[in-house]
Design a protein with these regions (language model features):
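Short beta-strand to alpha-helix junction loop
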Residues: 18-37, 85-89, 118-120, 238-245
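A conserved short coil-to-beta-strand element within the FAD-binding core of flavoproteins
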Residues: 48-61
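Short hydrophobic core segments
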Residues: 52-53, 70-90, 98-99, 150-158, ...
């Protein structure tokens, strides 16, 4: 509510879709333009195309080292972003600066990212989108699960539910642990109800081929993949299917396990998991516990959320706390 109130004060009109809030214009650039307009109104100096190479605390504040010149500052807010999507400007250099100032970094991995599958059984079904539940299984244990539109690609799996569980897979792979994803391609049915459905479909249609057995349920590109994994030939007649074969088909559909080889890289990730340890930050001000008047905010810290605006909210909330605290501290020191 505070975030909405802040942006409303800048002139942003919003609308809600379910539990999510969007600019009424449906343009992300509207938010950026309003922020830039407010900076102009407040006569805030903005310097671009400068690379910060280091920050040195002094007795009166900080010296900022850049590829152009040295600058002085009373306070520093590090809000450099992580390593995700570096073409937008966040190349991970903020981590090095924070480490030089004494902070500890939790290993960083891509998050909200696509997954590459080893010996991909659905490569020939690339382009298919289907409702599914995906579960990250890390080191033999379920870690996270999500339900939504699964996208099959030539190299692996994608889509919002895959993004939601990807951080757990990435962490597991970083630790050299086994990482798999269990896919339920028919979450509307239990194993028992799907088995009964297939039994009824078999009875009375004994001359139907297995190529047509799953028509009306799944995308045509998925059917041969399922049958292949269940070791059922496409031209087999349904009347020749045993109950054991049907149970095998049910398992392929309801508990399809793929092994993850790796994630896509940071440039394909929406955010990072990992970053500067939050234990080294005062939570109500975002000030460093090690360096006075140094503040850290946003994705630079070891906090990441699922899709749905949570990472944006973290950036805005911590930025607000850091900015307010920095201004108050500087004013009180003068």
């Amino acid at each position: 509510e505070d975030t909405i109130a802040f942006f409303t004060s800048l002139g942003l009109l919003t609308k809600a879709r379910g539990n999510y809030v969007y600019p009424y214009s449906d343009q992300a650039s509207t938010v950026l333009d309003l922020l830039k307009s407010e900076l102009d109104r407040l006569h805030v100096k903005i310097t671009t195309d400068v690379t910060v190479t280091g920050i040195s605390p002094t007795s009166h504040g900080f010296t900022i080292l850049t590829d152009h010149q040295k600058q002085k500052a009373d306070a520093i807010i590090l809000a450099c972003g992580g390593k995700a999507n570096s073409k937008l400007g966040s190349d991970g250099s903020g981590y090095a600066i924070a480490k030089e100032l004494g902070h500890t970094m939790v290993p960083v991995v891509p998050a909200l990212v696509q997954l590459k599958v080893k010996n991909h059984p659905f490569a020939k079904a690339a382009g298919v989108r289907t409702d599914a539940v995906v579960t990250a299984v890390c080191h033999g244990q379920p870690a996270a699960s999500d339900h939504g539109e699964l996208q099959l690609t030539a190299y692996g799996i994608s889509g919002i539910p895959v993004f939601q569980i990807s951080r757990y897979i990435a962490k597991s792979l970083y630790l050299k642990q086994d990482a798999k994803v269990n896919i339920d391609f028919l979450p509307a049915f239990t194993e028992e109800t799907f088995f009964e459905f297939l039994l009824k479909r078999r009875n009375g249609r004994e001359q139907m081929t297995c190529a047509d057995y799953l028509l009306g349920i799944f995308h045509q590109k998925l059917i041969p993949r399922f049958l292949e994994q269940a070791r059922i030939r496409m031209h087999t007649l349904t009347g020749d299917l045993s109950d054991t074969q049907i149970k095998s088909l049910v398992q392929v559909v309801k508990n399809n396990v793929v092994t993850i080889d790796t994630t896509n890289g940071f440039d394909n990730a929406q955010v990072c998991a990992g970053g500067i340890s939050t234990e080294e930050i005062t939570p109500d001000t975002m000030e460093s516990r090690y360096v006075r008047h140094l503040y850290l905010a946003g994705e630079l810290l070891d906090v990441d959320g699922i899709c749905g605006g949570y990472n944006l909210q973290w950036a805005w909330a911590t930025g607000y706390l850091a900015g307010t605290a920095a201004a108050n501290d500087i004013s009180s020191d003068r």
